[in-house]
């Protein structure tokens, strides 16, 4: 089961009443959706939320949005592969390749598309950060980068060398762009090393980031 944790535990930021109400609702809804059926995923989601909040405070991103996006980022992970594909079709999400090749990337996009209808009071940047947490982008905002990185380095992740390297960058307060780059290219390297399908859009992002870093 997930460790007993709430967004209110050890928080360093003062949230207003409206924000507190929303965060309490999100946490309650997440528990209903996956605490019993997917306890590991539930614990991961809470851990990402906590890590994202800490990073947001360190990197001058919005901690409320970071918490909200962290809690919701894997909302559609409770769906089967087939259900994720069907939902992507329903929301006309098209990555330009057959769905079965990119199914692991769909859950962020489908959650962002559907949850904005459920939680209309959440800022637009929350949905973009959720949508981008699986694929990334060349023009990531600070919040986008925070969620992308937090998903990869949260404490429940095994301390493999690639994750440790990115964690150390955060601990040393490296530039957020460098932290994101580390997390992104380590992810690309993992896909290649394990001989999995590499989404062409990921290669485009990689090349754009490489060129941008050389400017």
Please give the residue ranges for each predicted region.
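Charged phosphate-binding loop/patch that engages nucleotide di/tri-phosphates or the phosphate backbone
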Residues: 189-215
């Amino acid at each position: 089961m997930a460790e007993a944790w709430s967004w209110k535990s050890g928080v360093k930021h003062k949230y207003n009443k409206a924000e507190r109400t929303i965060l309490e609702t999100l946490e309650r809804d997440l528990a209903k959706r996956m605490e019993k059926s997917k306890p590991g995923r539930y614990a991961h989601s809470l851990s990402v939320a906590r890590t994202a909040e800490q990073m947001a405070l360190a990197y001058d991103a919005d901690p409320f949005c970071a918490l909200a996006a962290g809690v919701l980022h894997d909302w559609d992970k409770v769906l089967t592969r087939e259900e994720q594909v069907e939902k992507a079709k329903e929301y006309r999400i098209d990555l330009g390749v057959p769905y079965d090749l990119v199914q692991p990337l769909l859950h962020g996009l489908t959650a962002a598309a559907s949850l904005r209808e459920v939680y209309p009071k959440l800022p637009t940047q929350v949905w973009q950060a959720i949508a981008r947490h699986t694929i990334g982008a060349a023009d990531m905002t600070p919040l986008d980068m925070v969620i992308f990185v937090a998903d990869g380095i949260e404490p429940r992740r095994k301390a493999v060398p690639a994750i440790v390297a990115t964690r150390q960058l955060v601990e040393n307060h490296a530039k957020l762009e460098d932290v994101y780059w580390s997390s992104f290219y380590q992810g690309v390297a993992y896909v290649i090393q394990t001989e999995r399908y590499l989404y062409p859009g990921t290669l485009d992002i990689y090349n754009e980031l490489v060129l941008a870093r050389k400017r």
